[in-house]
Amino acid sequence: MNRLNCLAAAGALCALFVQPVFAQTVKVTPLGGIDGEFCAQDRALVFEDPNGTRVLYDPGHTVAGGGDPRLGRIDVILLSHMHNDHLGEAHIKAAGAGTCAKPDISVATPQSNVVDIALAKKSKIVTGSEMPPFFAARLKAGGGDPANSMLARFGGSVTVGGVKIATVAALHSNGVDPLFIEGELGKEMKAAGLAGDVGPATGYVLRFSNGLVAYLSGDTGILADQQLVVRDYYHASLVVMNMGDGFTTGPAEAAYVVNELVKPASVIPSHANEIGTVDGKLRPGSKTEAFVKAVKMPAYVPLSGHTMEFDAAGKCAAGC
């Protein structure tokens, strides 16, 4: 074989091994109440890095505890804030239990769904503000390792399984339901209509091993940080954006955030608090439809159980 042929063969061999690295994608799988739909209580998403690391975000009510067969391995759980629809004071009996409008959330979780899943999967829990001690105590009480409750406060980050996790500001309340506070104090707080304080709510910015940067808004309003931090510093190209109104930004406000402040390549609506789809299609007149129509970039509705794949630039490569 002459020198040119050797070089050509070497180049082809390099291409064989290098090309898949650039083709790697992050998989995003919604874990909602009804397969193939986007429903009122749906919050949970699983992100799978190309290296296999799996991140569960805001499991809430629609993950059926640590034994939910949809979970698979979970390396880290992210919780944006302590409200029950994200933390999970109870969960569905199984995927498909109840209806899209009213899932059967009848299985109580005294230590929270987040903790039950973390114990079952031996997962890390990454939170910000003053939330980590809450989870450390409950992991210990359940026979787990309290060190698995990890802190990533504003401006800082931690890396788990090759995924870099940073917390960013969210404009939202963050009270702990008194049912998670034991003894007379919890009873008195409940009677007074008070919640525990664990500091500000958070969003997350994730940097995956393929280079994709994703912004998970949590529950929030409009913030200057969505441009100054999320866009200008982190350069997020995929956004998961709450748009349910009342408790968070509504469709118009959420569209403003992604259109004018973050400007990602793609967006996934979240926290609709409504029946967003019927038979897997946008429900006419819904807030979800209004948001999808208002954004300037592709919006991909998170249909439960349907995996989407995103490349390093935040563009959908499959499943959308």
Description of each model-found segment:
Residues 23-70, 151-231, 309-320:
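Core dinuclear metal-dependent hydrolase active-site scaffold
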Residues 117-158, 255-320:
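Binuclear metal-ion centers of metallo-dependent hydrolases, dominated by the metallo-beta-lactamase
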Residues 52-56, 60-127, 133-134, 140-150, ...:
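Active-site metal-binding motif and surrounding structural segment of the metallo-beta-lactamase
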Residues 36-41, 63-65, 83-87, 127-136, ...:
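Active-site environment of divalent metal-dependent phosphoester hydrolases
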Residues 43-44, 70-72, 91-95, 140-142, ...:
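Short, glycine/charged-enriched secondary-structure capping and boundary segments
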Residues 44, 112-115, 132, 251, ...:
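Extracytoplasmic/secreted envelope proteins and their assembly/folding machinery
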Residues 8-20:
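Bacterial N-terminal signal peptides
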Residues 1-9:
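Bacterial N-terminal signal peptides that target proteins for export
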